[in-house]
Each structure stands twice: as structure tokens, then as C-alpha cells.
Amino acid sequence: VPELEAVFSAMEQCYNRITGSNDAKIQYNIGTKEIDVAYTDAQGMRMRIPLNQLSDGYKSTISLVADIAYRMAVLNPQCLGEVCKKTDGIILIDEVDLHLHPAWQKQILHDLTEIFPNVQFVVSTHAPEVINSVAREQVVVLENYQALPAPAETYGKDANGILRAIMRVKERPDDIMEKFEQFYHAIDAQEYTLAAEILGNLDEILGDDPDLTAMHIQLDLEQM
């Protein structure tokens, strides 16, 4: 059935992309009456598992791709196996990052546009890893019922930079930010003993942290 082949092909491409595999095959298991995915694992063994045993992230992404491919196949049966490549359109996806590991969030938009190259995707997200995978011109910030352009470049920016510049969210909890402010106030007031106490407290809470390393250096320099 051409429609089913198109759906299975899209699912296979999706599985290959999110797992790094290159030979996934989606198959119907007559015995269990379930859909399985067969692939070669890192040890070279051929594996076969039911799709419903995959993680939520895998299942939600593959199900999304399968749903899009199925709708394309039904609407454009004349395209046969090329339906995913030839069908154009606009698709809206709410919370595209839902259930996805951060590593997948970074590539989900790229993967969707590779599998469906003639589709324009309009997605919502709260994940910095999704936002920093596209250029500033492709981002619209919704704030107080207004659609605003991204206030800064997004592509390639680190997650903390996205939180600060685009989402306007502090990258640390308020109580930690307050301790940072107390440290710098103590430095400004030349209360170095107090600054050292605050910094020691932050060391206990945060452990190895590049910002704390810089603060230790600053405190040492101030006391010279």
C-alpha cells in the first residue's frame, strides 16, 4: 500500500535521525499485531522492539512524523512514495519540545524540515535548545498578547544566553542570585571576610561552577 509505505519511510527516517542509526525498518508484527522497529545496535546485533516500548520522547516524535506523513499520503495519493518530499503546506505544532531530551530538542526542527522539505513549520516552545537551533529572523516572541521580534541573535547562543536575552528569565533561582548580589555588595564595601563567607556558602551549594571560580579570583585580587 503506497500510503503505508510513505508513513513507514518517514518513521524510519525519524528513528534514524534521533538515534543515529542508519538502517531502521518499521514492520508490522503479525504475531503481536503491533508495529515494531528493527535496527542494528552498537554491537552489530540486529534488534527488533515494539514501538510502544520506546521512551516517551521517541514515541511522541515518531508519532508526530507518522501523523504528518499519513495526512500527506491521504491528501496526495498520486505522489506515492515521494509524498513526504513533494507535499507542501504549513503545519502548526504546540510545544514541539514536549518529552524530548535536550539533545533531541536541538535537532527536532532540522529533522522535521529534512523529512518534510516543502513544509513550513510554525511551532511554539519554551526550550532554549529549540530556540538556539534557528536564526533570530525565524523567532517570534509572544509577550502580553503581542508578537515581537527576537531582541537578540538566537542561533548558536548558549542556553543561559537564550534564557536571559530572549526569554528574560534568570538562569539561577532567586535565592542564589541574591547571594551573588550580596557577594558583590560586600566586595564593593571592602568587607572581604563577609564576601568570603558568602562565597563559601555558594561553594557548598553549587560545587564546581565557573562563575564561582571567577569570584574566587576577584576576591583574591581585591585582598592583595
Named regions from a protein language model:
Residues 1-86:
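Extended helical coiled-coil dimerization/tether regions that scaffold
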Residues 87-89, 117-122:
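Loop/turn-to-beta-strand initiation segments
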Residues 94-95:
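Walker B catalytic acidic pair
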Residues 98-102, 106, 133:
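Conserved D-loop-proximal element of ABC-family nucleotide-binding domains
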Residues 103-118:
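Conserved Walker B catalytic segment
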Residues 110, 114, 129-224:
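RecA-like P-loop NTPase motor core
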Residues 125-126:
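Conserved H-loop
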